[in-house]
A protein has these predicted regions:
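Ser/Thr-rich, low-complexity intrinsically disordered terminal regions
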Residues: 1-117
Length: 117
């Protein structure tokens, strides 16, 4: 469970194989699959809104790209009145990276099939 003042948040970085363009497309697909409305900032990062759920307020989700295939995801509670997030920010990040792994694995499998045929 994250605690933060004024806003609780959770972030994590993971490294993936693929070009910058491929990873950008994978992240876009992951956000769309999750149903999180997003906008692209400066052509190199995403900012999404995680829908409100039971016992959960609005969360802002950001994705940034770094050299070497590193993707950083951050989920942050949008209201300063919320001091504890009950693990929601970490679950948002985990859910996002699970989709990224699924999509990137599928893309890698499809690429290897097209090369062998």
């Amino acid at each position: 469970m994250a605690f933060g003042f004024p806003y609780p948040k959770y972030s994590q970085r993971r490294t993936f194989n693929g070009s910058a363009d491929e990873l950008f497309a994978v992240v876009r697909s992951a956000l769309e699959d999750l149903g999180w409305r997003y906008k692209v900032l400066w052509g190199k990062e995403f900012e999404a809104e995680v829908p409100t759920a039971h016992w959960s307020w609005h969360h802002v989700f950001k994705v940034r790209f770094f050299a070497g295939g590193v993707i950083e995801a951050e989920s942050k509670s949008a209201y300063s009145e919320i001091l504890f997030d009950l693990g929601r920010n970490r679950r948002n990040v985990d859910k996002f990276f699970a989709r990224v792994v699924d999509i990137s694995t599928t893309h890698a499998r499809d690429r290897s099939r097209s090369v062998t045929h």
